[in-house]
Structures are given as structure tokens and as C-alpha cells.
């Protein structure tokens, strides 16, 4: 698996599913930003939708925001044609949050299907979000 893919997948789960309590390299942050910008353009997010995505506000997502999530997940390989790529998730997310927590997330989330691939991506985001690490306490 090439380093581009590893970085992309790591950035995906941190920015969309895991939250910001993990540290990303500058390269990972840049790659995630590139994917966000490309997907925003591809699905033609409105300025209001872009603001929601940037604020990580995925409550009551529009169809465009759901398709943005699908685009992002597909760019990094965790979804392919609406199907979760479990081996990829286990290998890469496991390195970030631990194998056991990743297996628990997959057990809960693997059967999720939406009305279409965009809806599936949005529902998977919601499912994986429940496994994100608690924020670290500030001293």
C-alpha cells in the first residue's frame, strides 16, 4: 500500500470520523484539505454547506453534504461504490485508535446501508463518529 493512500486514509478518519484529538502531520493535513476542496467542487457545495462541513456539522445533512462524505471516503479508499472496505479500515484506523476499538466499530457499522451511496457514506460517518476518542483534557 503506498504512502499516499496511508496518509489519505489516516486523514479521512481524523477529519471526518475520529475527530481532532489525534495529531496529524502537515502532509496528512494538506492531503485532507485537498480532498475536501476537490469533493466540495465535485458535488458543488454551496457556501452554507461548505461552512457546515468546515465546522464538522453533519447534523441533518443535505444531499450535497452526504455526497461530499461519499466523495471523500471514496478518494481515500474506505468506500468503493457504496461498500465499506473493511480490511482498509481495520489496517489504517486500527493504527490510530487501536485494533480492538476498530473491530468494535466495524462490528457495529459494517451492515449500514443507506438509500444510495451518498446516504450510506453519511450514515457510516455517524456510526464511526460514536467511536472517536474523548478529547484530551487541557492542563
From Swiss-Prot:
**One GO biological process term:** sensory perception of chemical stimulus
Q: What does this protein do?
A: Present in the aqueous fluid surrounding olfactory sensory dendrites and are thought to aid in the capture and transport of hydrophobic odorants into and through this fluid.
Q: Which N-terminal stretch is annotated as signal sequence?
A: 1-19
**Subcellular localization(s) per the UniProt record:** Secreted
GO molecular-function term, one example from the UniProt record: odorant binding
The species this protein belongs to is Drosophila melanogaster
Give expression by tissue.
Expressed in ventral pits of larvae. In adults, it is not specifically expressed in chemosensory organs. Also expressed in stalk cells at the proximal tip of the wing disk.
Primary localization? secreted
Q: GO terms for CC?
A: extracellular region; extracellular space
**Intrachain disulfide bonds:** 39-71, 67-118, 109-127
The text of the family note is: Belongs to the PBP/GOBP family.
Q: Which SUPFAM superfamilies match?
A: Insect pheromone/odorant-binding proteins (SSF47565)
| Alphabetical keyword list | Disulfide bond, Glycoprotein, Olfaction, Secreted, Sensory transduction, Signal, Transport
Top-level taxon: Eukaryota
Query: What gene codes for this chain?
Result: Obp56a
Tell me the protein's name: General odorant-binding protein 56a
Mutation effect (residue 120 to S): In strain: 907A
Q: Which residues are glycosylated?
A: 23
Q: One Pfam family, short name please? A: PBP_GOBP
UniProt KW Hydrolase keyword: no
